[in-house]
Amino acid sequence: MAAGVAVLALALSACGEKKESVTSSVGAQSMTLMLDWFPNADHVGIYEAIANGDFEKAGLDVHIQVPSDPALPLKQLEAGKTDVAISYEPEVMLARNKGEPLVSVAAIVQEPLTSIVSVGSKHIRTAAQLRGKRVGDAGLAYQHAYLSTILSHAHVPAGSVKEINVGSNLVPAMLSGRVGATLGAYWNYEAIKLQRMHKHPNVIRMDQVGIPTYDELVVVARKSTVVDHPDELRRFVQALGRGYAAVRSDPQAAVDNLVKANPGLDPKFELASVRATLPTFFSSDASKPWGWMSADQWNAFGQWMLDQHLISNPNAVADASTNELLAGQGL
């Protein structure tokens, strides 16, 4: 695990990250966690675990790092500059395809958040209505593959749709009319933001239009950490699970703690987002512990990535996730 917090902070400051420290626990194991992006409702259980002392009770002194770019967390994890990172199932597969020995050790958001979103008087309510439209995305290869699969599934000729890379400007691209829809906006973030702006967004979720379901947000560690430090990781993952359980018990209190740690956030928006996202923090199978990942689901999504030539190495899929650190597992 990472040691020497001052040295680590110096190394990371050169990489353009913001580092958030939490109160140190004397004698606790220092551990660094890099978020996938800026703090938001998806991370509410992390901040709840900090506020409630769940990590401290587990003998861990957790330090949160906020990346300047969502592509950074797995790179920093690969380089050994953070102990664990939050990322996305497709990104884990892509990193493993390049030979990076990374493993997902828990799912935070257990279904896709990525959606097709449209606004205006001519809502796009079905994939078939994408015909003749301009669709904006962030330019990611797997988003292009999503669109191709969706169009094929809806029997829409790919040439009838113009794909436009709008970067992170998904909402402005929709509001300006530059695109008729976006693929990449989250139904629990951009769509709720548009609702609060009274823009009446229409949302089509990925798993409704031919894309195999996947875990949008996952906790990732190096395989060497899973092998060499399973006790620390197990304590971390299970403390995190207690944080998310507390969110389910009292979403308002959890949002209060999220906003207290990140004063720039809008409390009303975050509460709306947390309430919308809450069911996805837990398995649909109540017998499964928090963080559960379905091997069948990971294999099916990995096979889709292979079929789409996003990855070429079957080993990128095999053993990409493990449930052995979850409560009641692997003991």
Describe the predicted segments one by one.
Residues 16-18:
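Bacterial signal peptide processing site
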Residues 11-14:
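C-terminal motif of bacterial Sec signal peptides marking the signal peptidase cleavage site
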Residues 227-308:
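Secondary-structure end/capping motifs
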Residues 108-118, 199-226, 237, 276-280, ...:
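Periplasmic-binding protein-like
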Residues 22-167, 171-188, 204-205:
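Short, glycine-/small- and polar/acidic-enriched structural segments
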Residues 90, 169-172, 178-264:
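Pocket-lining segment of extracytoplasmic ligand-binding domains
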Residues 298-331:
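Conserved C-terminal helix/tail region of periplasmic/extracytoplasmic solute-binding proteins
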